[in-house]
């Protein structure tokens, strides 16, 4: 047996909207770990 014989599921992180794209309320803009991209005015942050 080996010590590195496991793999995690993909987390699908990153930016989810394109430049100048119209979005509706409640849509996901970025999925990230930590706060690499900081939220701006009228943007909420969820866990």
Swiss-Prot record:
The UniProt record lists the keyword Plastid: yes
Gene Ontology annotations for the cellular component aspect, listed alphabetically: chloroplast; cytosolic large ribosomal subunit
Subcellular location: Plastid, Chloroplast
Regions crossing the membrane: none
Alphabetic keyword roster: Chloroplast, Plastid, Ribonucleoprotein, Ribosomal protein
Family stated for the protein in its record: Belongs to the bacterial ribosomal protein bL27 family.
Keyword Magnesium: no
UniProt-recorded name of the protein: Large ribosomal subunit protein bL27c-2
Gene Ontology terms for molecular function: structural constituent of ribosome
Single biological process term from Gene Ontology: translation
PANTHER family: LARGE RIBOSOMAL SUBUNIT PROTEIN BL27M, RIBOSOMAL PROTEIN L27
Species whose genome carries this gene: Cyanidium caldarium (Red alga)
InterPro entries assigned to the protein according to its UniProt record, in alphabetical order: Ribosomal_bL27, Ribosomal_bL27_CS
């Amino acid at each position: 047996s080996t010590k590195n014989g496991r793999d995690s599921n993909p987390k699908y992180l990153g930016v989810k909207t394109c430049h100048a794209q119209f979005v509706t309320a409640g849509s996901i803009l970025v999925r990230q770990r930590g706060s690499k991209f900081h939220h701006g005015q009228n943007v909420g942050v969820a866990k």
